[in-house]
Amino acid sequence: MTKLENLMHEIFEKEGYEEYFVGPPIHGVGLEFEEPPLPAGHAFFHGEEPKDELKLGMVLSIGNCGLYLGEFGVRVEDTVVVTDKGYEEITAYSRTL
């Protein structure tokens, strides 16, 4: 998960948006609002140890970081479940404006 988190930071930096990238981008989903597994960035905010190992059936929110320009911003998350073939996206919103 740390590799994915680092890749997201690299993309924002490459595109010139690093200063607007707020918060860690990945966290587990379950009974609590944000829960393990938490990669390094998110674990730091929660005072926990990072857990990078992905296991079958884990549900993750990816993209939680938010992009803020001035007073307003947007926060879009994709929810996925880890499968034996990679992942299955379970988010059902449209990606078009």
Task: Set out the residue ranges of the language-model regions.
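Active-site neighborhoods and metal-handling regions in enzymes and metal-associated proteins
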Residues: 1-97
